[in-house]
Amino acid sequence: MNIITLTPGQLSLSQLHDIWRHPVQICLDASAIDSINASVACVNDIVAEGRTAYGINTGFGLLAQTRIADEDLQNLQRSLVLSHAAGVGDPLDDAMVRLIMVLKINSLARGFSGIRLSVIEALIALVNAGVYPLIPAKGSVGASGDLAPLAHLSLTLLGEGKARWQGEWLPAQTALKKAGLEPVALAAKEGLALLNGTQASTAFALRGLFEAQELFASAVVCGALTTEAVLGSRRPFDARIHAARGQQGQIDAARLFRHLLTETSAIAESHHHCNKVQDPYSLRCQPQVMGACLTQLRQTKEVLLVEANAVSDNPLVFADAGEVISGGNFHAEPVAMAADNLALAIAEIGALSERRIALMMDKHMSQLPPFLVKNGGVNSGFMIAQVTAAALASENKALAHPHSVDSLPTSANQEDHVSMAPAAGRRLWEMAANTRGVIAVEWLAACQGIDLREGLTSSPLLEQARQALREQVAHYTQDRFFAPDIACATALLAQGALQRLVPDFM
């Protein structure tokens, strides 16, 4: 099991990916302890001196003007968690819950939240023991933070709600006991510190980014395969074309295509002296389109990596000045906009792939048998597989609608502009599944097309891509039940079967 020594605010993208993919053991770096303790001391001083500070000894939201008596401060924090755990929908899977928990730990341990080290350590203990709170997928608008999801996370700390341990849903008290853990009691400000933040929104969008990286790589490989299958030209990938424009994403995408295709192949030599002048845009403009998508992936990475290491609590404790200041770092607008831009890239990756599939279906464009099968008429070949790809690509056009421009006031208009970042991130998962289905069909089709160039082979890397599929899915000599082949190709893509052929591009 991977062990991560957490220096707050310094998680890398590769660490975040590992946390999402696999159970981890978290160890908090000792350098964080002093700032954590200092922020708690500042909160304690405010309570002892009788000063009024939001979230410490006041109500919340529109009730912020209500002063809370000292004897009710613990109950205030517990009541906050219980009342805000109002999410709905299917439970998030363990991977997503684990990522949210580590993001929360990372933020709290920065030392601006006024939460005791013992509470942070209790969260770390949940992660290390594999106790995953039941967090419903829906219920946050991404300001004031992800209140409902993070409240459900916090319930388990209190011994309330449900949690999963070793694959079984249990009452939280039972799960804690089986894992050798105890519930905690919250002190002043701690409930609010746990609930305020963009950790669910950020985790949702990070999963979308991780899946988009796999989709981008897979689509580049399949685009190169299709270029070979339909006797496309390598000339549009010439580095000089892309340097003349200067768009870095485009330059780098073209480099990936050159890496995969190499200078030539037996297939390329077979049509070296053909009469074709230009290929259709879905082949010729791959570096331009995929390069633009790559730029979006990179920009999304920058935003999300900052947010994953950010302090998005409110109010913030500045212990060196003895101040507690209310602000708006809980507003997840940066995450929402990043997710919206990523949605465009995921949709376009699938849309371009679908157009290449359609090209292969047309015997005049592909110079292959109609629908990639011999004895057409008796056999329909890839006819309906292309329709499926079209349906998936079309769904993504609607799903790509921006969420960050939507807002509904909440909390009696106190919270009158929200980000909708959770929905913006969560829909990326469905979009990624759709695009993966499209790319799976293209992989099947392109390999079939190359098979039909009998006696000819592609470049070494593209032959590896074809072999990876052919080890699981046979060539089509006649019609057969098609859906299992799409499912198999889709599963292989999700496992990184094609991604591993592509050098790092992020």
Curated annotation (Swiss-Prot):
Modified how: Contains an active site 4-methylidene-imidazol-5-one (MIO), which is formed autocatalytically by cyclization and dehydration of residues Ala-Ser-Gly.
Domain of life, per lineage: Bacteria
Localization of this protein: Cytoplasm
Family: Belongs to the PAL/histidase family.
Cellular component, GO annotation: cytoplasm
Gene that produces this protein: hutH
Protein name: Histidine ammonia-lyase
Pathway linked to the protein: Amino-acid degradation; L-histidine degradation into L-glutamate; N-formimidoyl-L-glutamate from L-histidine: step 1/3
Cross-link named 5-imidazolinone (Ala-Gly), sites: A143-G145
One Pfam family it belongs to: Lyase_aromatic
Keywords linked to the UniProt accession: Cytoplasm, Histidine metabolism, Lyase
GO biological process: L-histidine catabolic process to glutamate and formamide; L-histidine catabolic process to glutamate and formate
Keyword Cytoplasm: yes
Protein species of origin: Salmonella arizonae (strain ATCC BAA-731 / CDC346-86 / RSK2980)
PANTHER family listed in its UniProt record: HISTIDINE AMMONIA-LYASE (PTHR10362)
Listed CDD domains: PAL-HAL
SUPFAM superfamilies in alphabetical order: L-aspartase-like
Main subcellular location of this protein, as a coarse class: cytoplasm
UniProt-listed InterPro entries: Aromatic_Lyase, Fumarase/histidase_N, HutH, L-Aspartase-like, Phe/His_NH3-lyase_AS
EC number: 4.3.1.3
HAMAP family linked: His_ammonia_lyase
